[in-house]
Amino acid sequence: MLERAQRTLKREVRYSGVGIHFGKSATLTLEPAKENTGIVFCRSDLLGERIPALLPHVYNTGRSTTLSAGDSVIATVEHLMAALRSSNIDNVIVRCSEEEIPIGDGSSHVFMQLIDDAGICTQNDKVPIARLSQPVYYQSQDTFLAAFPCDELKISYTLHYPQSPTIGTQYRSFVITEESFRKEIAPCRTFALYNELCFLMDRGLIRGGCLENAVVFKDDGVISLGQLRFSDEPVRHKILDLIGDLSLVGRPFVAHIVAVGSGHSSNIALGRKILEVLQP
């Protein structure tokens, strides 16, 4: 059985910023936690329940991933979760002073910086690295995801945006390690199409969105602070989101994930199927 030592942070770290959808300023605190705690969210502005970062606590997947427990809700967890998962952080208490995690620059960069600032501590207890007993898949309209047994965590993603000539079709495949995530995926920012901005605003979303935390694609070009960080930054960001969403399985696992046009809802659906076939 493949296993490794559990890991947590060496010290508490904080970051303050704005939430992209609700536009509220919030302070995020990451605290070390004991073995077998898992990743747990707490609303520091409420006396509500703790929210384990697990699939049964997924509350909403519209444009971001939201968790809940009782009356406590915490939104847009995926970029932080991707950073924690890719850094092999098993145990941490995440406190947030508002209902949404600060967005930073729209990527996982700020969360990787927080982890670096905190340092990583190896713990005594071990955690098994789970494997898939069989392939699983999820399909809905133009979205397809599959997970195959594999000796490493690999993600192959195809993004197809025929409605956006500036995005078009993009494909990337990575073996996910702390190094590959840090260099190839973590810097990649969230994005939106110019012609969907009004729709999102009408739904009460992206109230904190700006060019400091997102990239906007028009039919004839890109609106961004500076150049794209990669020519295929959108598909890399989709991989980032997928890592964050699948981390809610709650156990480290290895598999080859193949995705075509997936989003938060379908990512979570695949995560539930993966959970059913994990061993040990």
UniProtKB/Swiss-Prot annotation:
Cofactor(s) annotated in UniProt: Zn(2+)
GO terms for cellular component: membrane
GO MF, one annotated term: UDP-3-O-acyl-N-acetylglucosamine deacetylase activity
Metabolic or biological pathway, per its Swiss-Prot or TrEMBL entry: Glycolipid biosynthesis; lipid IV(A) biosynthesis; lipid IV(A) from (3R)-3-hydroxytetradecanoyl-[acyl-carrier-protein] and UDP-N-acetyl-alpha-D-glucosamine: step 2/6
Listed InterPro entries: Ribosomal_Su5_D2-typ_SF, UDP-acyl_GlcNac_deAcase, UDP-acyl_GlcNac_deAcase_C, UDP-acyl_N-AcGlcN_deAcase_N
Gene Ontology annotations of biological process type: lipid A biosynthetic process
Enzyme Commission number(s) from the entry: 3.5.1.108
Statement: the UniProt record of this protein carries the keyword Transit peptide: no
Residues annotated as binding Zn(2+): 79, 237, 241
Catalytic residues in the record: 264
Substrates-to-products reaction catalysed: a UDP-3-O-[(3R)-3-hydroxyacyl]-N-acetyl-alpha-D-glucosamine + H2O = a UDP-3-O-[(3R)-3-hydroxyacyl]-alpha-D-glucosamine + acetate
Keyword annotations from UniProtKB, A to Z: Hydrolase, Lipid A biosynthesis, Lipid biosynthesis, Lipid metabolism, Metal-binding, Zinc
Function: Catalyzes the hydrolysis of UDP-3-O-myristoyl-N-acetylglucosamine to form UDP-3-O-myristoylglucosamine and acetate, the committed step in lipid A biosynthesis.
Record-linked NCBIfam families: lpxC (TIGR00325)
Family named by the database record: Belongs to the LpxC family.
Protein name as catalogued: UDP-3-O-acyl-N-acetylglucosamine deacetylase
Gene behind this protein: lpxC
